[in-house]
């Protein structure tokens, strides 16, 4: 038998003659393949095979300069893909700031892109240059399995990231409490398992299901994708449907972020105006935690801390939110409450914050001693946020109790700043109360007396400044949270945009090929498929452009500054340890 091949082709360069006939069996293949009937003319006039195809030409019909150009370009892209995704993985390992739930999904995406850069790109380049598959059927099926599983895993990871961002924005209280690294690992595992189950068994064992292998020798493509209708269906399920879902989710994320931005701007604009009006309530409280049921659990525990000119009594009270309030929190988690209790609850619901009990939480009442005065502001019974009355023009008077034993006030501004920083995170309650102790001869009883003493204008201004500082801290925390969400949304938008740009041309050609099997030149097929690979090259660039932490860590790794960073961190910890030990006796006073 004599084997004659009437095809001499160079897929990437259309100026070289090609007699490939594009039949329905070639639809949607990564490389324009030759149908078995049109590629091979079997002649029985000779006892041996003769061939005029490129099987004996290692360059596949290309010129030497074409081979150099193809090898250099594709090799460079593969190298950039490998280095970029290795940087992502190593950066995640060495920088603890990157070990967030959202970045676990990016780590999974980087692993899929790394597989494509190491295996898929190089084998496909060899296939293009040689213009035939010379590694055998088993290697062909393994390559296709790895290629399609990794590519589909990239799509699934993008889908998971989109849903994660969507629920984080729209359900910050309910979803973030469940958003842990363990659940992220489960979602990542499902993405890979689903991708493997969908593609690997069908690619590896389809020839055994149908009883024969229809892929001709020297070619490599998925056997069950020989029909355009099947190829069309897989394109819809693997690309168009996920892209549609991700686009809708991103649009919802964008609208919700814009809504949050307007709400925060309104909160900041009305904050200064409403502060003077609501600072003193007719009942003595501008805001209250009336929506929560305060429940005293036994004896109150109080402790005293001293920071500079501020003296604090932290009185622990346990409280449980009412059933009605819990329902409101779960049903309308999008709204931003203006009270401090709701703000603290919203912040505690984040997975990045400190874990708090599901039912019982702690409220700390702060007792403030104004510098240079012998009075102390103490917490009282009402659970108000800033229950303060001062002798201003528009304000009332403030009831305070005189302390019999005057406390020494330290006027260190640094310690005062630390004082403000410590209680700015808590629902602050400024009220008037002090206890004066009268010790009897037997030291058996302690009496507490109260007296009304108006504050001076200077002291009232200072107290009001503390309340304004607290409100600004709450607004700042909301603003920082919004900025963080915007950065995550920007990263998602960049990744999604790169995915759509790189994957759309090939999938459009798949749709066109369903109705016109000879309208797409082989060069376009190969370029379109390679463009899908380039998406794995672009993703690390998106991380660096949209995330400053990734960018600085990449720079540190490329410049080999890991050891310097570790030494600086150790030196900083040693300095902090010395400072801490020096301050221990002072804090113990």
Swiss-Prot record:
It is found in: Cell membrane; Postsynaptic cell membrane; Basolateral cell membrane; Endoplasmic reticulum membrane. Residues 91-103, 164-183, 252-490, 546-589 are cytoplasmic. A motif (Basolateral sorting signal) lies at residues 274-280. The modification Phosphoserine is found at residue 384. Disulfide bonds join 140-220, 516-519. InterPro entries: GPCR_Rhodpsn (IPR000276), GPCR_Rhodpsn_7TM (IPR017452), Musac_Ach_M3_rcpt (IPR001183), Musac_Ach_rcpt (IPR000995). Keywords: Cell membrane, Disulfide bond, Endoplasmic reticulum, G-protein coupled receptor, Glycoprotein, Membrane, Phosphoprotein, Postsynaptic cell membrane, Receptor, Synapse, Transducer, Transmembrane, Transmembrane helix. Residues 283-295 have a biased composition (Polar residues). One of its GO terms (molecular function) is acetylcholine binding. Glycans are attached at residues 6, 15, 41, 48, 52. GO terms for biological process: calcium-mediated signaling; G protein-coupled acetylcholine receptor signaling pathway; ligand-gated ion channel signaling pathway; phospholipase C-activating G protein-coupled acetylcholine receptor signaling pathway; positive regulation of insulin secretion; positive regulation of smooth muscle contraction; saliva secretion; smooth muscle contraction. Gene3D superfamilies: Rhodopsin 7-helix transmembrane proteins (1.20.1070.10). Residues 1-66, 130-141, 206-228, 514-525 are extracellular. It holds the Pfam family 7tm_1. Expressed in cerebral cortex, submandibular gland, hypothalamus, pancreas, liver, and ileum. It is a multi-pass membrane protein. The chain crosses the membrane at residues 67-90, 104-129, 142-163, 184-205, 229-251, 491-513, 526-545. Residues 275-295, 323-356 are annotated as: Disordered. The muscarinic acetylcholine receptor mediates various cellular responses, including inhibition of adenylate cyclase, breakdown of phosphoinositides and modulation of potassium channels through the action of G proteins. Primary transducing effect is Pi turnover. PANTHER family: 5-HYDROXYTRYPTAMINE RECEPTOR (PTHR24247), MUSCARINIC ACETYLCHOLINE RECEPTOR M3 (PTHR24247:SF183). Belongs to the G-protein coupled receptor 1 family. Muscarinic acetylcholine receptor subfamily. CHRM3 sub-subfamily. Homodimer; the dimers can form tetramers. Interacts with NALCN. Interacts with TMEM147. This is Muscarinic acetylcholine receptor M3. It comes from Mus musculus. The gene is Chrm3.
